[in-house]
Structure formats: structure tokens, C-alpha cells
Amino acid sequence: ADPASSWRAAIQPIVARKIPWAAVFGNHDDEGALSRRDLMAVQQSLPDCLSEPGPENLSGVGNYILDIRASADEQTAARLYCLDSQSYAEPKTDGYGWIQPDQIAWYLEQAQAARAANGGQPLPVLAFFHIPLPEYNEVWDKHSCQGQKQEDVCCPHFNSGFFAALRQGGDVLGTFVGHDH
């Protein structure tokens, strides 16, 4: 099947129920005939899509923010960061992609601006991207974890410092990835 049809088929149950939705790209998404920009256009053509291509000057496609509004006063009550963790590393590095320095700087700018707009307090934030951070391995290997791990954490061989930036930003309560399946 062509990539556009696959996207439409995957999202169809959500669209049929008229549920607002958003997505981040995975490392396999643009391995076919369509680029990430093309796939973003497919996403945005579907009903109730909240995905955005994001700033043109940032690495990747699909770096965007979804603000969650308070029902009482329309103030931003929480925030979702969606980031493109790329596909694969450069040939010299090998392995999987990572959040790039310009994306990290963008996140920190956005976190600082949101904190300032919220009276100096951070908003509660969740971050979504595809490829896990190297720190996922460290947590599993060095700390008490519950659950099952039936394969290795497939993270980049390079640590871009995004986890440290999340700590510096002080707003992200959790990160969610989909790479290991």
C-alpha cells in the first residue's frame, strides 16, 4: 500500500469517531515514496488533525505545541510538546536519530516563555517523540522498574542532551515514545 493510504487507514477509526488527534513521525514513516512534509500534508488533510509541521527553521517535521485550555477561562492549563526525533543517525555515528540542538534550543525558549506567561510557574507538560532517549536505558539498568522489557531500548548511540534540557526547562512531567514495539 502507498504511505498516504496507510496513514488514512491507521487513523480511520479515530476520524470515524470524530476524536481530535495528533501524531509524531517514526523512523520508518518516510522510508517509502513520501517525505515527512508530504506525510504531514496527508495528516493535515484528515478531519480533526491537530498535527502541525512546526517551524521551518527547525530540524525535522512535526515540532509543535498543543496547548490544553482550562474550561473555565480558556487559559493554558497544560501543554504537549511533539518533536521529530529524526529517523537514522549519520553514517559516521550509526544507529537511530535524536533530538537536534536547534530543537532543544526551541524547546527551552518555549518553556521559558510559557513559564513567564504563567506568572513564573511552569505549566504541567508531557513530551511526545518517537525514538527513546539514552536515559531510558539508564533508568531500566540502574533503578527499580516494574513491567516487562522484552527487547533492548533502541535509542541513539549519541546523547544529544535533551533529557538535561528537559530537567533545565523544569516543566516536563513525562516523555512518551513509540519506537520499541
Segments predicted by a language model, with ranges:
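Active-site metal-binding loops of divalent metal-dependent hydrolases
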Residues: 1, 27-28, 85-86, 131, ...
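His/acidic metal-ligating clusters that form di-metal
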Residues: 16, 79-81, 93-181
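Functionally engaged cysteine thiol sites
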Residues: 2, 8, 168
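Short beta-strand segments at enzyme active-site cores
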Residues: 1, 22-24, 125-129
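Extended active-site neighborhood of metal-dependent phosphoesterases/phosphodiesterases
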Residues: 5-120
